UniProtKB/Swiss-Prot annotation:
The lineage of its organism: Archaea, Methanobacteriati, Methanobacteriota, Stenosarchaea group, Halobacteria. It comes from the Archaea. This is Phosphoglycerate kinase. GO terms for biological process: gluconeogenesis; glycolytic process. The keyword Cytoplasm applies. Monomer. It comes from Haloarcula marismortui (strain ATCC 43049 / DSM 3752 / JCM 8966 / VKM B-1809). Signal peptide: none annotated. ATP binds at E330, G356, G357, D358, T359. GO terms for molecular function: ADP binding; ATP binding; phosphoglycerate kinase activity. GO terms for cellular component: cytosol. Substrate binds at D20, L21, N22, R35, H58, Q59, G60, R61, R115, R155.
Length: 400
């Protein structure tokens, strides 16, 4: 790790802090989640050390229902740090500049959604982003820039990559811990068995992860939609798209050759589900994959026998990495797979990193604690890229 951290920053300065507070929004209401918990550590430390703090963050994308103001985020953050947090409905307009100038030591000000700025979203080179009006207007108002948004570090957006080229830049505590944990699989050497639980909805993510880690990982335990696509490649009639959802057929057409090739080349490393769960008259029902005769049911989870097969593999591992959920865990009926493997990991002393998609949410939903795992990542896309060894531009600019 070659970037500067908060340990290298003198107390009491005025700092611009990029967080990732992007959250689920239901009926216009921002939902509290673990990202606020995590980033509260960084913000609370800055407050305690007398910094004047202005926060940058994004929410949703233009045109979507979750594209809302950060006013609610400021209130939620205040609850998490048990400290007053102000909000201004501009990102770098005259009122924002005025409120920034009025900051005193220990004050926290949340600026408006960065994605409401025209300069923010286009993916462009960091050098281009550093010259935008957004960056050039704010850079002289602060002593330093802190990026704590590891989960957005794969995006070349102005608030993430522009400021480090024109200001002293540091990594926040979330950036620091996520980077160390999520690069461990690429850098750490293990003497014993390394297992990866791979689920989720995107076949391309699974293919990329397995391709890059086939020499590091001894066993891939598959589930989710991606796992069903591998079952289809093995000859099972699964992957039924309900209500024209196009979760399976489109991905199969795009990735079938890669999946079939991977299954053929690495069959001894890949463990597939032996049974699957579906809804039957409102209840959970399970079926052995060997008994499936036609593609006519939408499967929503791996079955209990699969969890029983996966659990001993996990218990015998020195290290376990998790990418994505094994089923539709938000519905308790179909949480058996995801909750089952997470409980198996929690019951061991292995080195573990859990991340990807909503997996961290499953830990909270089913009564587990984060400290039962080595590290629980709040990152999605950045986690996948870290696993595959891809460069994270938001990290790279901090290391310059």
């Amino acid at each position: 790790m070659t970037f500067q951290t908060l340990d290298d920053l003198d107390d009491g300065q005025r700092v611009l802090v990029r967080l990732d507070l992007n959250s689920p929004v239901e009926d216009g209401t921002v939902q509290d989640n673990r990202r606020f918990d995590r980033h509260a550590e960084t913000v609370s430390e800055l407050v305690d050390r007398g910094f004047e703090v202005a926060v940058l963050a994004h929410q949703g994308r233009p045109g979507r229902d979750d594209f809302v103001s950060l006013a609610q985020h400021a209130e939620i953050l205040a609850d998490h740090i048990d400290h007053d947090v102000d909000f201004v409905d501009e990102t770098y307009g005259p009122q924002a500049i005025h409120d920034i100038a009025d900051l005193d030591g220990g004050d926290v000000l949340v600026l408006e959604n960065t994605r409401m700025c025209d300069d923010e979203l286009p993916e462009e080179d960091p050098e281009v982003k550093s010259q935008t009006e957004f960056v050039q207007t704010l850079k002289d108002e602060f002593d330093a820039y802190i990026n704590d948004a590891y989960s957005a570090a794969h995006r070349s957006h102005a608030s993430l990559v522009g400021f480090p080229l024109v200001m002293d830049a540091y990594a926040g505590r979330v950036m620091e811990t996520e980077y160390e944990a999520n690069t461990a699989i690429a850098e750490k050497e293990f003497d014993g068995q390394v297992t990866m639980v791979v689920g989720g909805t995107k076949a391309t993510d699974v293919i990329d992860v397995m391709t890059h880690l086939d020499e590091k990982v001894d066993d891939f335990l598959l589930g989710g939609i991606a796992g069903e696509l591998f079952l289809r490649a093995a000859g099972y009639p699964v992957g039924y798209d309900i209500d024209d959802a196009n979760l399976y057929d489109e991905q199969w057409e795009e990735n079938s050759e890669k999946i079939e090739s991977m299954l053929e080349d690495h069959r001894d490393q890949i463990t597939l589900a032996v049974d699957l769960a579906y809804e039957d008259d409102g209840d959970r029902a399970e079926q052995a994959v060997d008994d499936i005769e036609e593609k006519s049911v939408s499967y929503l989870d791996v079955g209990s026998e699969t969890v029983m097969e996966y659990s001993p593999v996990i218990r015998d591992s020195e290290a376990v990495f998790v990418k994505g959920a094994l089923g539709m865990f938000e519905d308790e009926r179909f949480s058996v797979g995801t909750a089952g493997v997470l409980e198996a990991i929690a019951d061991t002393d292995c080195f573990s990193v859990v991340g990807g998609g909503d997996t961290s949410r499953a830990i909270e939903m089913y009564g587990m604690e984060e400290d039962e795992f080595g590290h629980v990542s709040i990152a999605g896309g950045a986690y996948i890229r870290a696993l595959t060894g891809a460069e994270l531009v938001g990290v790279e600019v901090l290391q310059r």
